[in-house]
Amino acid sequence: MTKMLVLYYSSYGHIEAMAKAVANGAKQAGATVALKRVPELVPEAVARSSGYRLGQEAPIATVAELADYDAIVIGTPTRFGNMASQMKNFLDQTGGLWAENKLVGKVGSVFTSTGSQHGGQESTILSTHVVMLHLGMVIVGLPYSFKGQMRMDEITGGSPYGASTLAEDENHRDRSPSANELDGARFQGRHVAEVAAAMQLGRSHLQPELVR
């Protein structure tokens, strides 16, 4: 059975909601899913005064456990078109796994959130893809078979690079992920799980010396 990690960082709960949808989609495809988050770097007093969503129930992941999964789906909000520092700090600690090729051949995928429609969704996902490529992972996005990313009747996240959500409306008020955005996240989770399962099946028919 395919083992998937949905690894996320969420300040205000938008990515947390998307992460849960990704996990649910993967479970629909028969994957065993762990939903975990990376450590917070912001001091608790500052996070509390800034309205961060504290006490999220997902446990904290360890770097070493990344090698235990067949697929890793990362969720991070944007920070000026790049992943959040909390996620970058975590991934910067994977040097040991990189040196031993522990993540080579594993499926990787990314989803994100931004505060505006053009706030860096695609660049955030692509910058995270770069890390995955250095680790030898096989990248999977959100294919156009998810028709929700083609909608023109509403402002919505989602692109072929990955699911996404907008965290604010046009009046800069907090906005929860829409039904369409959550559908995209579930689709991505299911798609990643299916690709990872197919890769597992394919490897089972290879000669051992040809695997990775």
From Swiss-Prot:
Q: Which residues form the Flavodoxin-like domain?
A: 4-192
State the residue spans of region: Disordered: 161-182
The record's family statement is: Belongs to the WrbA family.
- This one is known as NAD(P)H dehydrogenase (quinone) 3
* Annotated substrate binding sites: 98
Specify which residues bind NAD(+) according to the UniProt entry for this protein. Answer: 12
What is the species of this protein?
Answer: Rhizobium meliloti (strain 1021) (Ensifer meliloti)
SUPFAM superfamilies for the chain: Flavoproteins
Sorted UniProt keywords = Flavoprotein, FMN, NAD, NADP, Nucleotide-binding, Oxidoreductase, Plasmid
Under InterPro entries, the record lists: Flavodoxin/NO_synth (IPR008254), Flavoprotein-like_sf (IPR029039), Flavoprotein_WrbA-like (IPR010089), FMN_Rdtase-like_dom (IPR005025), NQO (IPR037513)
Cofactor dependence is on: FMN
What GO terms are given for molecular function? Answer: flavin adenine dinucleotide binding; FMN binding; NAD binding; NADH:ubiquinone reductase (non-electrogenic) activity; NADP binding; NADPH dehydrogenase (quinone) activity
